[in-house]
Amino acid sequence: MAAQVRVLRQRIRTAKSMKKITKAMELVATSRIAKAQDQVAASLPYARAITEVLTALASNARIDHPLLTPRERVRRAGVLLITSDRGLAGGYSTNAIKTAESLLARLRADGKEPALYVIGRKGVQFYRFRNRPIAASWTGFSEQPTFADAREVGQTLIKVFTAGVDDADGDPGPDGVFGVDELHIVSTEFKSLMTQRPVAKILGPMQVEDRPRAEGLLPAYEFEPEAEALLDALLPKYINTRIYAALVESAASESASRRRAMKSANDNAVEMIEKYTREMNSARQAGITQEISEIVGGANALAASGSEV
């Protein structure tokens, strides 16, 4: 009985240590959700403004720009996948990878060669373990992304997209770049603390929607400098802004998923502590009962031997 009590006491100590760790991780994840939500809210006005300006430029000027004009034939499509750098986040990265895999399968079915760009160690590990090619990868900022991180990713994607596909038989062509004709992004939308949804969206070319104009005077725009120069300056910022928005929303989703996973682990630790405590108390009770029985039995034996004398 004593050995069993020692084992159970050690299990209780282990469960309590695990509970401290999971509770701390839950609190950290909760604080990061709030920070990421603030980043999302702060980025929205800029994203709306730059989208409105670009829509006005594209609608009021007949301009052919690589980031605006769909290619006649899409030979290769780039896919940017956002996953986490660390584990213990439930199905966050797994669900994003599943969405990316579905997109890659659709692209192949349409006769398009996919080129994969991955953010986060979990995504990189998934594809490298399976010997799947990755065109470029970035790690180390999935939980707390900055606009500088988004700009670094955006520079690579803009370069390959503006280059287009002009290679053949493994030769990158005169520009030395294995370009793409289309850009997609797979990220995770933050709906609430309990709901996050992986989504796949078109990143390039920019999709300009023809919105109905209100009755009355039509708005007049004067571009200074010329519309072409403005597009050259603003379209890369638009791509970077889209990537940054996806990064911060995915960061909020990752933290929410990790918080949920850690809360579940914390609840399980509490249940384990209660279970092992009950078992330890039962074992101690059984040990005490056995000792009392042995004492009573010994006393009865002594009494019996004394009466015989």
Swiss-Prot record:
It is a peripheral membrane protein. One of its GO terms (molecular function) is proton-transporting ATP synthase activity, rotational mechanism. Pfam families: ATP-synt. Its main location: membrane. Gene3D superfamilies: 3.40.1380.10, ATP synthase, gamma subunit, helix hairpin domain. GO terms for cellular component: plasma membrane; proton-transporting ATP synthase complex. It is found in: Cell membrane. The keyword Chaperone does not apply. GO terms for biological process: proton motive force-driven plasma membrane ATP synthesis. Transmembrane segments: none annotated. Keywords: ATP synthesis, Cell membrane, CF(1), Hydrogen ion transport, Ion transport, Membrane, Transport. The keyword Ion transport applies. It comes from the Bacteria. Produces ATP from ADP in the presence of a proton gradient across the membrane. The gamma chain is believed to be important in regulating ATPase activity and the flow of protons through the CF(0) complex. NCBIfam families: ATPsyn_F1gamma, PRK05621.1-2. F-type ATPases have 2 components, CF(1) - the catalytic core - and CF(0) - the membrane proton channel. CF(1) has five subunits: alpha(3), beta(3), gamma(1), delta(1), epsilon(1). CF(0) has three main subunits: a, b and c. Belongs to the ATPase gamma chain family. This is ATP synthase gamma chain.
